[in-house]
Amino acid sequence: MTHAIVTGANGFVGSAVVKELLNNGVSVCAVVHNDHRDNLPDHANLQIVSCELSNMKTLPGLLDESDYDVFYHFAWAGSAGPARADTALQLQNAQWTVDALHAAKEIGCQRFLCAGSIMEHETMA
């Protein structure tokens, strides 16, 4: 793997994955919400792209290059507070994950890794 895309890159898991990838010589495109980048390092091999989950279908057109190997999807809206109980939002997250998968395919990624959480269980319970 030489190039990776990470959504939710400024979050707890995403930022740790970005740092690990960079430390291992992988060029990373960090996809963030509203240009949030507080948890991301300054690094020559890091490109930061702002793209909302609701606009994930537009991600391929926002990238500087197209030779990405893997797509890590960690972005999720409403993972804290009252939004956790918003069934419509949690189901929308599932659709946005499908949109991310389609974007990864369009970009040419060979692998798509999506991490879940208890949110899927709580929404369905």
Pin down the residues of each PLM region:
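Short loop/helix-cap segments at secondary-structure boundaries that form the rim of catalytic
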Residues: 37-44
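N-terminal Rossmann NAD(P)H-binding glycine-rich loop of SDR-like oxidoreductase domains
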Residues: 4-24
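Rossmann-fold cofactor-recognition segment
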Residues: 44-55
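Short beta-strand/turn micro-motifs composed of small residues
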Residues: 8, 32, 116
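Conserved Rossmann-fold NAD(P)-dependent oxidoreductase catalytic core, especially the SDR/UDP-sugar
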Residues: 73, 98-125
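NAD(P)H-binding glycine-rich loop region in Rossmannoid oxidoreductase-like domains
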Residues: 53-92, 103, 123
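Conserved glycine-rich Rossmann-like NAD(P)H-binding loop of the short-chain dehydrogenase/reductase
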Residues: 26-36
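Structural motif
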Residues: 3, 69-70, 111
